[in-house]
Design a protein with these regions (language model features):
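Cleaved targeting-peptide boundary
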Residues: 17-26
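A short linear-motif detector with a strong N-terminal bias
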Residues: 22, 36-38, 69-74
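Polar/charged, Gly/Pro-rich intrinsically disordered segments
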Residues: 26-61, 86-151
Length: 151
């Protein structure tokens, strides 16, 4: 009986995915974005909490409105964000255009994005319709984590 319990415990440890803290997630996401061909200029990564939960936010610099940038950014956050010790509630992508154009923001529920980009459990059209929203977003600096304040 003890051998069976030990076997299942050992198997579950091997099969579980590693979990990382905010600094590691930040570093992994930055490296991942830099390795993607055609990924826009990465301005910054923010990890913070709001009333709804934890948020992972990418700020990118773009010259044109290209929906592929939204997919690339959300996919990168999904692939890396799934490994956070404390799960994220939302993924936010802010596209910064040359002056005087106002930045545009996109947000997605993190579980929904992970189910689309990583687990392939939902189709693209459902993710776009049910999970992705396009709006101008404002960050509250007081919500930023210490990691982002000390840059």
């Amino acid at each position: 009986m003890m051998k069976i319990i030990t076997f299942f415990m050992f198997t579950s440890i091997i099969m579980s995915k590693p979990l990382y803290g905010d600094k590691q997630i930040y570093s992994m996401l930055k490296n991942h974005c830099e390795m993607i061909n055609g990924f826009p200029n990465l301005l910054d990564i923010h990890i913070y909490s709001n009333k709804e939960g934890r948020v992972l936010q990418l700020d990118i610099e773009v010259d044109i409105n290209n929906k592929n940038y939204v997919f690339m950014g959300m996919k990168a956050m999904s692939l890396i964000g799934q490994y956070s010790k404390i799960p994220f509630h939302k993924f936010i992508l802010i596209e910064h255009y040359p002056e005087p154009k106002i930045p545009s923001g996109f947000e997605s529920d993190s579980d929904c994005a992970i189910n689309y980009f990583v687990n392939k459990k939902i189709p693209e059209n459902r993710w776009i319709k049910d999970c992705l929203s396009n709006s101008i977003l404002q960050r509250k600096i007081e919500n930023w984590s210490k990691l982002n304040k000390n840059k």
